[in-house]
Regions:
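Mg2+/Mn2+-dependent nuclease catalytic core
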Residues: 90-107, 114
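Short, electropositive alpha-helical surface patch
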Residues: 133-154
């Protein structure tokens, strides 16, 4: 007889990882709101397209999130240059290159060819946040000899925090 009980330890790890990932997203949003107020950049979260398939009794909506090629964040920097960023978070000590969704590599490659800045914002459960150039992420195997990264691999891309704790993704925001 198969044991269908879920491992409570693994469940707790999953809950904690999800909460940390949501905090990472809130930190990113707060930084971009700050840059918008300063007139440094206008970078917005790309809405996830939701496809409604129907309603259950009681009005509950049934549907699914459609796969998308657009990155999580898109916007413009002061001076007119476009910027695109895909945000990824892991509760593990490494992040796989395959975490970028199908279709996104081609999308980001095209934007980069046209002169946009493109990055992957990588968050790790130990609190580290990194802004990795898309060209480095895309050629991870050539840079690191494997298709995943660890925090030790990407220290040069670490995003500092300001004295108030804000992620200084584009710099301190005092420019």
């Amino acid at each position: 007889m198969e044991n269908n009980r879920k491992d409570p330890r693994r469940q707790l790890i999953g809950v904690v990882s999800k909460a940390l990932g949501q905090q990472f997203e809130r930190d990113i949003n707060a930084a971009f709101d700050h840059y918008r107020r300063l007139g440094v950049a206008s970078i917005e979260k790309t809405p996830e397209p939701f496809h409604m398939t129907g309603r259950e009794n009681g009005g509950k909506v049934v549907g699914f999130y459609e796969k998308k090629a657009q990155p999580d964040y898109a916007g413009t920097l002061r001076g007119g240059r476009s910027v695109y960023m895909e945000a990824k978070f892991t509760g593990s000590n490494r992040m796989e290159q395959s975490r970028v969704s199908p279709g996104q590599p081609e999308y980001l490659d095209e934007k980069m060819r046209l002169g946009a800045f493109c990055y992957v914002l990588a968050g790790f459960s130990h609190g580290g946040a990194y802004c990795i150039p898309w060209s480095v992420w895309r050629s991870m195997k050539e840079h690191y000899g494997r298709k995943y990264i660890t925090e030790n691999d990407i220290t040069q891309y670490k995003i500092p925090r300001t004295t108030t704790g804000m992620l200084a993704i584009l710099g301190t925001g005092k420019e």
